[in-house]
Amino acid sequence: MPEGDTVLQTAARLHEALAGQVLTRSDLRVPRFATADLTGRTVLDVTARGKHLLTRIEGGLTLHSHLRMDGSWRVYAPDERWRGGPGHQIRAILGNAEHTAVGYRLPVLELLRTSEESRAVGHLGPDLLGPDWDPGLALDRLLAAPERPLGEALLDQRNLAGIGNVYKCELCFLARVTPWLPVGALPDGVLPRLVTLAERLLHANRDRPTRTTTITSELRTPPGPDTSPAPSPGPAAARSRTRPPVRVRERLYVYGRARRPCLRCGTPIRLADQDDRPTYWCPGCQSGPTP
């Protein structure tokens, strides 16, 4: 699932393959821009803004794309087989003499003037991986709606840009609160530490091929107080007393681990929808309302 760190990696790959090169092939397979021809123009740079990709092209043009849930950009050598999906899922092709970038299943693809990029990304909050990162502004925006559930607030890119559903679940676990707890009900000091941890986690994963939240030094000081109850008697509790706090083979604490034992307390991880997103939490470690 693309989030701020993976989008940044995608931007870096596209920039390396396309920037400074003249396009010899251009194919935008969306009705509005199907006749647009970018061949002969030089790609200036490719940059990430939150979870958005901006490919800036000679002549004051920007190709704006968003991966959402399952979109992707792949880069291929001239003789390499395209393996990103069937041909009908291709939405964009940008090629030069050395590489071809192919966009698959792109739910958002538009060509706009570079001077009008704010139409696409001007609504975004501070970018967790960007030069404009401002934790104070992100905190203010989160606190502007204290009644809003924390999980929904973290996903709102107007508050802070770059968090997706995986990080939402993991951050709430690390804060020891459920995603349904209102922002204003968080214990004192937890939200600022959570915002700081979000930035640290995305930076820790920005160059990793596989995202993890369980084997990084950024987790040495958890953002929330330990409000988890003592484990109830039984096999799970016995296992939790001897289980190390982190097992290297597990990349994530809760996301994708429904019904499996919590890495901290052994309680089975729960799964429910929040705003149509699958949401994972540990009822033993995380306090707050649940569905």
Label the model's feature ranges.
Residues 63-176, 182, 189, 194:
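Phosphate/anion-contacting hairpin/loop surfaces
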Residues 1-124, 283-291:
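Acidic, proline/glycine-enriched N-terminal capping motif
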Residues 22-37, 47, 81, 142-291:
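Basic, nucleic-acid-binding surfaces and adjacent catalytic neighborhoods in DNA/RNA-processing proteins
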